């Protein structure tokens, strides 16, 4: 039996069905902290479903998801909330919360043992995602990109300090760059790489293959003819696979910075 990597977030043989519809089939991944992993695939491939299973938000119909080799359900939601933060696709809220209120929600799991720097944590998280000026604004009056940056600040605030026991921390992000302008896409991905360098596991659903190629250490590709593919970004994201999964021919080009990107069409 394979030994679980300490701090690893994994799923094995996961299938998710709703009625007769299969949302995800036979998905097995093992993720280790300190790396940026991009989950890629065409629409409907099951990317968000896989992320929700890894977050412990969705119980798989078959298979299991684990953290440190233990079922996510065994950890319990209060404990998981101290170790993983989820940024969903949908960013609207039902009440008139301000941007600062939303970021403060990231500190809610720590309410039983607050630190002395709670206000500073929120301020620094908002500065990192360039939303300080938006603090008093009602979230639902913001643009999609502004909302996304507020929710990213919330996720960062939730995981701000390393765990006293050294346990791994995980940022699980569903299309964090989809609504962002070009500059904020790259600043957000650089920020996520910086957090990975601090030992945080970063898992992001992305649609932009060039962002994944530039910033992700590894990719999980759904929708390939041979099934799920996981591995180092440069090894997996080859033109033949891209054309097979997305049905788009592409040409790799290397920029002046040495990073390979893709031209499509």
Language-model regions: role of each:
Residues 71-85, 95, 112-113:
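ABC ATPase NBD coupling module
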Residues 63-71:
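Conserved ABC transporter NBD signature motif
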Residues 9-11, 24-26:
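Conserved structural motif at the start of ABC-family nucleotide-binding domains
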Residues 117-134:
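Conserved ABC ATPase "signature" region
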